[in-house]
Amino acid sequence: RFTVEGVHWVLQNGELVAARDTEFARDPDFGYDDLTLEEWVNSKVGAPGEIAEISATDLAGGDLLKVTSVLNVASDAQFVVINATNYLQLATLVEAIEESERQGKVFIYRTGPSFVRARAKLGPPDLADLTQFASSSTGRHGLVVVGSSTELTNVQLNEMVFNHSRIQVLELNTQALLDSGNYGPELKQLADEVGQGLAKGSVVLQTTRSKTCGPEMTMAESGRMISQALVEIVRQLPGDNPPGWVIAKGGITSHDILKSGFDVSMTTVLGQA
Protein backbone atom coordinates (compact mmCIF):
# COMPACT_ATOMS: atom_id res chain seq x y z
CA ARG A 1 0.00 0.00 0.00
CA PHE A 2 1.22 3.48 -0.89
CA THR A 3 -0.19 6.98 -0.45
CA VAL A 4 0.81 9.66 -2.97
CA GLU A 5 -0.80 13.11 -3.32
CA GLY A 6 -3.57 12.03 -0.99
CA VAL A 7 -4.51 8.93 -3.00
CA HIS A 8 -4.22 5.55 -1.31
CA TRP A 9 -2.91 2.90 -3.72
CA VAL A 10 -2.85 -0.88 -3.40
CA LEU A 11 -0.35 -3.03 -5.30
CA GLN A 12 -2.24 -5.94 -6.87
CA ASN A 13 -0.59 -8.36 -9.28
CA GLY A 14 2.15 -5.87 -10.06
CA GLU A 15 -0.28 -3.02 -10.76
CA LEU A 16 -1.18 -0.05 -8.57
CA VAL A 17 -4.93 0.24 -8.06
CA ALA A 18 -6.68 3.08 -6.22
CA ALA A 19 -8.00 1.71 -2.93
CA ARG A 20 -11.52 2.81 -3.80
CA ASP A 21 -11.43 0.45 -6.81
CA THR A 22 -10.52 -2.64 -4.77
CA GLU A 23 -12.93 -5.22 -3.37
CA PHE A 24 -12.28 -3.90 0.14
CA ALA A 25 -13.95 -0.60 -0.79
CA ARG A 26 -17.08 -2.53 -1.78
CA ASP A 27 -17.61 -3.88 1.73
CA PRO A 28 -21.37 -3.60 2.48
CA ASP A 29 -20.77 -2.00 5.88
CA PHE A 30 -17.44 -0.21 5.60
CA GLY A 31 -17.28 0.55 1.88
CA TYR A 32 -16.40 3.91 0.37
CA ASP A 33 -16.04 5.65 -3.00
CA ASP A 34 -13.60 8.44 -2.10
CA LEU A 35 -10.44 8.79 -4.16
CA THR A 36 -8.36 10.87 -1.74
CA LEU A 37 -7.95 10.62 2.01
CA GLU A 38 -9.20 14.19 2.33
CA GLU A 39 -12.42 13.22 0.55
CA TRP A 40 -12.71 10.18 2.81
CA VAL A 41 -12.36 12.32 5.95
CA ASN A 42 -14.98 14.75 4.65
CA SER A 43 -17.40 11.91 3.95
CA LYS A 44 -16.99 10.55 7.48
CA VAL A 45 -17.08 13.68 9.62
CA GLY A 46 -18.41 16.36 7.27
CA ALA A 47 -16.60 19.69 6.75
CA PRO A 48 -13.84 19.09 9.31
CA GLY A 49 -12.09 22.32 8.40
CA GLU A 50 -8.70 22.62 6.75
CA ILE A 51 -6.88 19.30 6.46
CA ALA A 52 -3.10 19.45 6.74
CA GLU A 53 -0.94 17.22 4.56
CA ILE A 54 2.61 15.89 4.69
CA SER A 55 4.03 14.92 1.30
CA ALA A 56 6.02 11.82 0.47
CA THR A 57 8.61 14.14 -1.10
CA ASP A 58 9.28 15.87 2.23
CA LEU A 59 9.56 12.53 3.98
CA ALA A 60 11.81 11.09 1.26
CA GLY A 61 14.10 14.12 1.54
CA GLY A 62 14.35 13.68 5.29
CA ASP A 63 13.14 17.25 5.86
CA LEU A 64 12.53 16.70 9.56
CA LEU A 65 12.14 20.41 10.33
CA LYS A 66 9.41 20.90 7.73
CA VAL A 67 7.53 17.74 8.70
CA THR A 68 7.69 18.61 12.40
CA SER A 69 6.46 22.14 11.72
CA VAL A 70 3.35 20.80 9.97
CA LEU A 71 2.58 18.69 13.03
CA ASN A 72 3.33 21.49 15.48
CA VAL A 73 1.01 24.03 13.85
CA ALA A 74 -1.88 21.57 13.55
CA SER A 75 -4.75 22.78 15.71
CA ASP A 76 -6.73 20.66 18.15
CA ALA A 77 -8.67 17.88 16.40
CA GLN A 78 -7.24 18.85 13.01
CA PHE A 79 -6.72 16.03 10.54
CA VAL A 80 -3.28 15.48 9.00
CA VAL A 81 -3.01 13.32 5.87
CA ILE A 82 0.28 11.46 5.52
CA ASN A 83 1.73 10.47 2.14
CA ALA A 84 4.38 7.74 2.21
CA THR A 85 5.64 5.00 -0.07
CA ASN A 86 8.20 3.11 2.03
CA TYR A 87 9.42 2.41 5.56
CA LEU A 88 12.27 4.94 5.35
CA GLN A 89 9.70 7.69 4.88
CA LEU A 90 7.66 6.35 7.77
CA ALA A 91 10.80 6.38 9.93
CA THR A 92 11.22 10.10 9.18
CA LEU A 93 7.56 10.65 10.06
CA VAL A 94 7.96 8.82 13.38
CA GLU A 95 11.00 10.94 14.22
CA ALA A 96 8.99 14.09 13.53
CA ILE A 97 6.05 12.83 15.60
CA GLU A 98 8.31 12.09 18.56
CA GLU A 99 9.84 15.56 18.36
CA SER A 100 6.37 17.11 18.22
CA GLU A 101 5.25 14.99 21.18
CA ARG A 102 8.21 16.23 23.20
CA GLN A 103 6.84 19.70 22.60
CA GLY A 104 3.45 18.73 24.02
CA LYS A 105 1.47 17.51 21.00
CA VAL A 106 -0.79 14.46 21.27
CA PHE A 107 -1.93 12.50 18.22
CA ILE A 108 -4.64 9.95 17.51
CA TYR A 109 -3.88 7.60 14.61
CA ARG A 110 -6.05 6.04 11.93
CA THR A 111 -3.54 4.02 9.96
CA GLY A 112 -2.63 0.80 8.24
CA PRO A 113 -0.47 -1.78 10.03
CA SER A 114 2.75 -0.60 8.37
CA PHE A 115 2.72 2.49 10.58
CA VAL A 116 2.60 0.34 13.71
CA ARG A 117 5.83 -1.37 12.71
CA ALA A 118 7.47 2.00 12.02
CA ARG A 119 6.15 3.58 15.25
CA ALA A 120 7.46 0.65 17.29
CA LYS A 121 10.78 0.82 15.39
CA LEU A 122 10.66 -2.83 14.45
CA GLY A 123 12.48 -4.31 11.50
CA PRO A 124 11.05 -7.01 9.26
CA PRO A 125 10.31 -10.24 11.14
CA ASP A 126 13.08 -12.84 11.18
CA LEU A 127 11.83 -15.89 9.31
CA ALA A 128 14.16 -18.01 11.45
CA ASP A 129 12.14 -16.93 14.49
CA LEU A 130 8.94 -18.01 12.74
CA THR A 131 10.46 -21.39 11.88
CA GLN A 132 11.61 -21.88 15.47
CA PHE A 133 8.16 -20.89 16.72
CA ALA A 134 6.44 -23.38 14.41
CA SER A 135 8.82 -26.20 15.41
CA SER A 136 7.88 -25.75 19.08
CA SER A 137 4.45 -27.31 18.50
CA THR A 138 5.87 -30.77 19.37
CA GLY A 139 4.67 -32.29 16.12
CA ARG A 140 0.97 -31.63 16.65
CA HIS A 141 -1.15 -30.74 13.65
CA GLY A 142 -2.44 -27.26 12.91
CA LEU A 143 -5.82 -25.56 12.59
CA VAL A 144 -6.59 -22.88 10.01
CA VAL A 145 -9.80 -20.90 10.71
CA VAL A 146 -11.03 -18.84 7.76
CA GLY A 147 -13.80 -16.34 8.41
CA SER A 148 -12.97 -13.85 5.66
CA SER A 149 -14.76 -14.43 2.34
CA THR A 150 -13.02 -11.84 0.17
CA GLU A 151 -11.79 -12.75 -3.30
CA LEU A 152 -8.19 -12.47 -2.09
CA THR A 153 -8.82 -14.86 0.80
CA ASN A 154 -10.47 -17.36 -1.56
CA VAL A 155 -7.44 -17.27 -3.87
CA GLN A 156 -5.09 -17.79 -0.92
CA LEU A 157 -7.24 -20.60 0.47
CA ASN A 158 -7.42 -22.42 -2.87
CA GLU A 159 -3.64 -22.10 -3.27
CA MET A 160 -3.04 -23.55 0.18
CA VAL A 161 -5.37 -26.51 -0.34
CA PHE A 162 -3.85 -27.18 -3.78
CA ASN A 163 -0.32 -27.25 -2.38
CA HIS A 164 -1.26 -29.23 0.73
CA SER A 165 -3.66 -31.84 -0.59
CA ARG A 166 -3.62 -33.86 2.65
CA ILE A 167 -5.15 -31.05 4.68
CA GLN A 168 -8.79 -31.68 5.59
CA VAL A 169 -11.30 -28.93 4.79
CA LEU A 170 -14.48 -28.59 6.88
CA GLU A 171 -17.10 -25.93 6.27
CA LEU A 172 -19.50 -24.05 8.52
CA ASN A 173 -22.72 -23.51 6.57
CA THR A 174 -23.19 -19.85 7.40
CA GLN A 175 -26.52 -19.43 5.64
CA ALA A 176 -28.05 -22.30 7.61
CA LEU A 177 -26.58 -20.80 10.78
CA LEU A 178 -28.03 -17.35 10.11
CA ASP A 179 -31.42 -18.68 9.00
CA SER A 180 -31.86 -20.96 12.02
CA GLY A 181 -30.60 -18.63 14.75
CA ASN A 182 -29.96 -21.75 16.86
CA TYR A 183 -27.27 -23.99 15.45
CA GLY A 184 -25.94 -25.55 18.64
CA PRO A 185 -26.03 -29.28 17.73
CA GLU A 186 -24.47 -28.63 14.33
CA LEU A 187 -21.64 -26.63 15.92
CA LYS A 188 -20.96 -29.49 18.34
CA GLN A 189 -20.87 -31.97 15.47
CA LEU A 190 -18.48 -29.75 13.51
CA ALA A 191 -16.26 -29.37 16.59
CA ASP A 192 -16.12 -33.16 16.89
CA GLU A 193 -15.15 -33.46 13.21
CA VAL A 194 -12.41 -30.85 13.63
CA GLY A 195 -11.09 -32.68 16.70
CA GLN A 196 -11.07 -36.01 14.87
CA GLY A 197 -9.33 -34.40 11.92
CA LEU A 198 -6.61 -32.89 14.11
CA ALA A 199 -5.80 -36.36 15.41
CA LYS A 200 -4.78 -37.35 11.87
CA GLY A 201 -3.56 -34.15 10.25
CA SER A 202 -4.02 -30.41 9.86
CA VAL A 203 -7.52 -29.02 9.35
CA VAL A 204 -9.06 -26.01 7.64
CA LEU A 205 -12.28 -24.76 9.22
CA GLN A 206 -13.84 -22.36 6.74
CA THR A 207 -17.10 -20.49 6.46
CA THR A 208 -19.23 -20.61 3.32
CA ARG A 209 -17.15 -18.94 0.60
CA SER A 210 -19.79 -16.37 -0.36
CA LYS A 211 -21.01 -13.44 1.73
CA THR A 212 -24.18 -14.35 3.59
CA CYS A 213 -26.65 -12.29 5.57
CA GLY A 214 -29.30 -13.36 8.05
CA PRO A 215 -32.96 -12.33 7.85
CA GLU A 216 -33.47 -8.73 9.03
CA MET A 217 -29.76 -8.50 9.90
CA THR A 218 -27.02 -6.22 8.65
CA MET A 219 -23.85 -7.72 7.22
CA ALA A 220 -22.01 -6.57 10.35
CA GLU A 221 -24.53 -8.33 12.62
CA SER A 222 -24.30 -11.45 10.48
CA GLY A 223 -20.52 -11.33 10.63
CA ARG A 224 -20.55 -11.16 14.43
CA MET A 225 -22.89 -14.16 14.62
CA ILE A 226 -20.67 -16.17 12.26
CA SER A 227 -17.57 -15.24 14.24
CA GLN A 228 -19.25 -16.32 17.48
CA ALA A 229 -20.11 -19.67 15.90
CA LEU A 230 -16.46 -20.21 14.95
CA VAL A 231 -15.49 -19.36 18.52
CA GLU A 232 -17.97 -21.92 19.88
CA ILE A 233 -16.51 -24.61 17.62
CA VAL A 234 -12.97 -23.85 18.80
CA ARG A 235 -14.01 -23.80 22.45
CA GLN A 236 -15.55 -27.28 22.09
CA LEU A 237 -12.39 -28.89 20.70
CA PRO A 238 -11.15 -31.79 22.86
CA GLY A 239 -8.62 -30.60 25.42
CA ASP A 240 -6.47 -33.72 25.16
CA ASN A 241 -5.43 -32.96 21.57
CA PRO A 242 -5.14 -29.19 21.05
CA PRO A 243 -3.81 -27.89 17.74
CA GLY A 244 -0.05 -27.36 17.63
CA TRP A 245 -0.49 -24.07 15.79
CA VAL A 246 -3.38 -21.88 14.62
CA ILE A 247 -3.84 -19.51 11.70
CA ALA A 248 -6.95 -17.30 11.80
CA LYS A 249 -7.89 -15.40 8.63
CA GLY A 250 -10.11 -12.32 8.80
CA GLY A 251 -10.02 -9.23 11.00
CA ILE A 252 -12.90 -10.15 13.29
CA THR A 253 -12.09 -13.86 13.11
CA SER A 254 -8.44 -13.52 14.11
CA HIS A 255 -9.30 -11.39 17.14
CA ASP A 256 -12.23 -13.47 18.36
CA ILE A 257 -10.58 -16.87 17.86
CA LEU A 258 -7.55 -15.77 19.86
CA LYS A 259 -9.34 -13.88 22.63
CA SER A 260 -12.56 -15.83 23.05
CA GLY A 261 -11.81 -19.18 21.42
CA PHE A 262 -8.50 -19.83 23.18
CA ASP A 263 -8.84 -17.33 26.08
CA VAL A 264 -5.59 -15.59 25.13
CA SER A 265 -5.18 -12.23 26.88
CA MET A 266 -1.59 -11.42 25.93
CA THR A 267 0.66 -12.39 23.03
CA THR A 268 4.09 -11.66 21.62
CA VAL A 269 3.94 -10.08 18.16
CA LEU A 270 6.96 -11.16 16.12
CA GLY A 271 6.58 -8.39 13.58
CA GLN A 272 4.79 -6.92 10.58
CA ALA A 273 5.85 -8.28 7.20
Where in the sequence are the language-model features?
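Active-site pocket-lining segments that scaffold enzyme catalytic pockets across diverse folds
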Residues: 78-104, 110
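Short, flexible loop segments at boundaries between secondary-structure elements
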Residues: 111-139, 270-273
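General beta-strand structural signal in soluble alpha/beta enzymes
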Residues: 49-56, 80-84, 107-112, 117, ...
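Conserved, well-ordered active-site substructure
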Residues: 243-245, 249-273
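A glycine- and small/hydrophobic-rich beta-loop-beta segment
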Residues: 132-230
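A glycine- and small-aliphatic-rich helix-loop capping segment at beta-alpha/alpha-beta transitions
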Residues: 6-18, 124-129, 260-271
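Cap/lid and interdomain-hinge subdomains that line or gate substrate/regulatory clefts
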Residues: 1-90
